[in-house]
């Protein structure tokens, strides 16, 4: 099917339309709920895992039969770091496939008008061209450390495409870059680089440490997008995009790990020294998504990295430190 873009596919003018946000308690889902409420949507359906286990097909069927949402945003997923992916591969591929298959099929069967499936930049090959275009999908081998999760997410994209091709159903997919913001994971053992840096600098500041040492040289380039920008992009795509191909969602702005660390250090107010352990690995030299397709649709990010870090640190102080 041909792609359709622009105002002619604008579909979310009814602010009372019922919208099911799957995974509303996570980093992504909670931001999407905030954005929808901010834009005046009043009929959001939100279910905790205890209320609705998305891996149970019969329960998901029953939910859609009773609630009959008009739109679905699928932000629910089993996520984790390298250690978790290596230790529980069956969980990462199995649980995510179950969630996706159950929600996508039930949404179609029960007349959902449109579904947005959210994936991850890890769907792309380990040695993808930089910046990574949507067309890089399935062109080479994945990063082995998270291939179980990545394969499940690729299957989600392909499931949406299959329902569009066979049934003409409006299911679309968005692939976010590295995200950060309120409700991020700040756990010392399994958080990603940005929240990990924020926690380390904060604890060093509180404890009066003289130095924070970061792994590597600080030279790798990374891209970060504030989760509120992602949420804005999701609502934009749900409203304005209808196409077979998935859409990259990124900031388009690169920063070295060294620059990021300096910025986090400044935002947190740590006045000690920043050191680098160059005996430790740097990881991939560059990872940037090509988000020109999304830009051509008329969407651009609004939150600068500095402002986003300040907002995230404020949230961290109020919600993590005070627990």
UniProtKB/Swiss-Prot annotation:
It catalyses: GDP-beta-L-fucose + NADP(+) = GDP-4-dehydro-alpha-D-rhamnose + NADPH + H(+). InterPro entries: Epimerase_deHydtase, GDP_fucose/colitose_synth, NAD(P)-bd_dom_sf. Its EC number is 1.1.1.271. The modification N-acetylalanine is found at residue 2. NADP(+) binds at residues 23-29, 153, 176-179, 192. CDD domains: GDP_FS_SDR_e. Highly expressed in roots and flowers, less abundant in leaves, stems and siliques. The keyword Secreted does not apply. One of its GO terms (molecular function) is GDP-L-fucose synthase activity. Pathway: Nucleotide-sugar biosynthesis; GDP-L-fucose biosynthesis via de novo pathway; GDP-L-fucose from GDP-alpha-D-mannose: step 2/2. The record marks 153 as: Lowers pKa of active site Tyr. The active site is at residue 149. One of its GO terms (biological process) is 'de novo' GDP-L-fucose biosynthetic process. Keywords: Acetylation, Isomerase, Multifunctional enzyme, NADP, Oxidoreductase. The record marks 120, 122 as: Important for catalytic activity. Substrate binds at residues 200, 215, 222, 282. Pfam families: Epimerase. The keyword Oxidoreductase applies. Belongs to the NAD(P)-dependent epimerase/dehydratase family. Fucose synthase subfamily. Binds and stabilizes MUR1. Homodimer. Catalyzes the two-step NADP-dependent conversion of GDP-4-dehydro-6-deoxy-D-mannose to GDP-fucose, involving an epimerase and a reductase reaction. Not involved in the synthesis of GDP-L-galactose from GDP-D-mannose. HAMAP family: GDP_fucose_synth (MF_00956). This is GDP-L-fucose synthase 1. It comes from Arabidopsis thaliana (Mouse-ear cress). The gene is GER1.
